[in-house]
Amino acid sequence: MELLTGAGLWSVAIFTVIFILLVDLMHRHQRWTSRYPPGPVPWPVLGNLLQVDLDNMPYSLYKLQNRYGDVFSLQMGWKPMVVINGLKAMKEVLLTCGEDTADRPQVPIFEYLGVKPGSQGVVLAPYGPEWREQRRFSVSTLRNFGLGKKSLEDWVTKEARHLCDAFTAQAGQPINPNTMLNNAVCNVIASLIFARRFEYEDPYLIRMQKVLEDSLTEISGLIPEVLNMFPILLRIPGLPGKVFQGQKSLLAIVENLLTENRNTWDPDQPPRNLTDAFLAEIEKVKGNAESSFNDENLRMVVLDLFTAGMVTTSTTLSWALLLMILHPDVQRRVQQEIDAVIGQVRHPEMADQARMPYTNAVIHEVQRFGDIAPLNLPRITSRDIEVQDFLIPKGSILIPNMSSVLKDETVWEKPLRFHPEHFLDAQGHFVKPEAFMPFSAGRRSCLGEPLARMELFLFFTCLLQHFSFSVPNGQPRPRNLGVFPFPVAPYPYQLCAVMREQGH
């Protein structure tokens, strides 16, 4: 067999280029209808990859929304996507068409990391029987272990005391509060999943926090986007292992905790935690190949709850303290309400929330302004849908831009400013506009929302009950900007926590 040389090689190259362009043209042609959402013209093969800033997607989408409207299209590689913006369009997609937009697309990097049929957890699982079974189990089990009940409130209250002790130990010193906040929230989640609490100085806890941070960084930005666009790259020997070291380490940590729990589990005793309850379900369905209760799915469900339940709440608390040192007038007013309703001795309780409209408004405004999850995880349409008179075909990937709702200029008086009055009426009563969607909406809304609301209220009020927070002397005023991607955390900052005196 002769090797191709000269003119032959040129012929093959030209044929390959023409073939790629024809395939690209066919991909585009199926979307060239008068009712398909408009968008920037994609490049061959790369699509719009070079036309958006993957390190600051919310701003890129904001500019595109201003140009093309609330519903516009993008193409990332071969994949066509439709971005949904604004309250009206978001309600149509997540609520009106909720049944047809609840599915998830396949994501190659997650498949490489072990997300596959039978072990997809809750967050990434396709919309169907397995997802329903696991979501129903997670919601009911968390409820049985105290979600919204007094038992869980006691756990959070006790952890709030440990958190205050940690701040007391460093009172008056410039500190970055993030590690302490992460520790507190992690312990609440660990209590629910493993019935276990870690001391804040525990090397295992410190290691877990670092690995979790690394794992989230690995699945965001340019490299994972390119791997998803061209999954053949995942077959390059050694590349995936190097790119996803944090993910592998996190999986090993979770597996170790599950092994410890499994070794002490007594099936004849009532379950101590969510893991025990899942193990009991595995025993019940032994021999049923269609059940989603298995060891692999246990690992994924725990990963879902542990990662999503921890980083979102701790990051929101970090935003809360930053905004308090930037707005001391708001901080003083919250403390006045705490003193009037709770006092400075009794521990805050969830029952206090209804009598604290200003504090409640501040917590909600922190969530709106912090906007820690600007982009929902992608959805995929299971049938043709109509949104704002546009026709979105079956199999289209949807990107819900939640930031566009939390900053919707038609809803919020001062969308780009921290303004707790967004959640107060003229009489000072708490109100919640329908555009407040930090936990998403519809069938895929965050199952841990009740837990997050409890943690935010109890941790925040306990901290402001005991401390006043300020910018350290001699340091510049921190910026109130976030660092994309998920979760959008504040730029690193320091604060001083000073213990409040009685009556102050």
From Swiss-Prot:
Q: Entry's PROSITE patterns?
A: CYTOCHROME_P450
Q: Cellular component GO terms, alphabetically?
A: endoplasmic reticulum membrane
Location, primary (coarse class): endoplasmic reticulum
The region annotated as signal peptide is: none
Q: Where in the cell is it found?
A: Endoplasmic reticulum membrane; Microsome membrane
**Superkingdom:** Eukaryota
Tell me the protein's name: Cytochrome P450 2D10
